Curated annotation (Swiss-Prot):
Pathway: Lipid metabolism; fatty acid biosynthesis. One of its GO terms (cellular component) is cytoplasm. This is Beta-ketoacyl-[acyl-carrier-protein] synthase III. Gene3D superfamilies: 3.40.47.10. The keyword Lipid metabolism applies. The gene is fabH. It is an enzyme of class 2 (transferase). Belongs to the thiolase-like superfamily. FabH family. It comes from Campylobacter hominis (strain ATCC BAA-381 / DSM 21671 / CCUG 45161 / LMG 19568 / NCTC 13146 / CH001A). It is found in: Cytoplasm. SUPFAM superfamilies: Thiolase-like. It catalyses: malonyl-[ACP] + acetyl-CoA + H(+) = 3-oxobutanoyl-[ACP] + CO2 + CoA.
Length: 333
């Protein structure tokens, strides 16, 4: 049976940094308050760039590292909740054009909020395993600054902009002697719409009561409730995927969770007995970048020499919907 591999990773964040001290001048908050509750020190903000612009820059880097030419990419999928256009064209179509990919390439977007990259992995690897595609470019890209209410101190301190991309490819003739399990070993995704209103961006079409018109189009979150559900759900999901694949926590080279909040990351890490050396944490530098957070973290681990060919990595994410998921991957090959 064919398998899929993650050949490469790439990321891009816009150059402008907005620090906690900058936010002190904008809303009633403080660096101490933000760091204590979130672990975030700064975030990057896209001033004159769209999600598609950032996606193309992250994808260019991932493709350059993959050993695959642009002509060999036969599908591009973007995960985003902040697309360049309201409903069409898709950000994937826009990004394919920016990259100069083949005309007629399969291109579409998905929306799974902070779990978007896990969903991309599942869809992309399924296309490859089925034989429908050979090389799939997946991109999580977000301009969350465009949906943040900059007067709401509870949410505006949390989010940043950026993009992360990966090239997935058929494992044919790419095993290079690495013993199984290899490639994309297992992925689990799930959802529960019962608590959708705890984390949402309502519009006039949403029919949500008690939200004034001037607050439509902004991200709304009940943070304490989301925190409790996220920690429990993520912990359970990781336990299941490890048990299913007979992998012990100490066998994981890198645990790369969605970078939402340092307290959530620490809570899940401690519940599962991962060490600091295993855990990749970038939330302090970039804030919550939703679907881009996991590939941005993977890219940083790669550039720092922590993510290597053959590394066994565990990813997990939880986001609006609710959506969540986990993935077990042997990187590279």
């Amino acid at each position: 049976m064919k398998n899929a591999a993650m050949l490469s990773i790439g990321a891009y964040v816009p150059p402008y940094e907005l620090s906690n001290f900058d936010l002190e001048k904008m809303v009633e908050t403080s660096d101490e308050w933000i760091v204590k509750r979130t672990g975030i020190h700064t975030r990057h903000i896209a001033k004159n760039e769209t999600a598609g612009d950032m996606a193309a820059k992250a994808a260019d880097l991932a493709i350059s590292r993959s050993g695959i030419s642009k002509e060999e990419i036969d599908a591009i999928i973007c995960a985003t909740i902040t697309p360049d256009f309201f409903c069409m064209p898709s950000t994937a179509c826009i990004t394919a054009e920016k990259l100069g990919l083949n005309k007629g390439i399969t291109a579409f977007d998905i929306s799974a909020a902070c779990s978007g990259f896990i969903y991309l992995l599942e869809i992309g690897s399924a296309l490859i395993k089925s034989g429908a595609k050979k090389n799939v470019l997946i991109i999580g890209t977000e301009k969350l600054s465009s949906i943040v209410d900059w007067k709401d101190r509870a949410t505006c301190v949390l989010f940043g902009d950026g993009a992360g991309a990966a090239v997935l490819s058929c494992m044919d003739n790419k095993n290079n002697g690495i013993s199984k399990p290899y490639g994309i070993i297992d992925i689990h995704t799930a959802s529960d719409g019962n608590k959708a209103e705890l984390l949402m961006t309502p519009t006039k079409n949403s029919n949500i009561k008690d939200i004034a018109d001037e607050n439509l189009g902004f991200l709304h979150m009940k943070g304490n409730e989301v925190f409790k559900i996220a920690v429990q759900t993520l912990s359970n999901d990781v336990v299941k995927i490890l048990k299913k694949n007979n992998v012990k926590p100490e066998e994981i080279d890198l645990f790369v969770p969605h970078q939402a909040n340092f307290r959530i990351i620490e809570a899940v890490k401690n519940r599962l007995n991962f060490t600091d050396n295993q855990c990749v944490v970038t939330v302090g530098k970039y804030g919550n970048t939703s679907s881009a957070s996991i590939p941005i973290a993977l890219n940083e681990a790669y550039e720092n020499g922590r993510l290597k060919n053959g590394s066994l990595i565990l990813l997990d994410a939880f986001g609006g919907g609710f959506t969540w998921g986990s993935a077990l991957i042997r990187f590279g090959l």
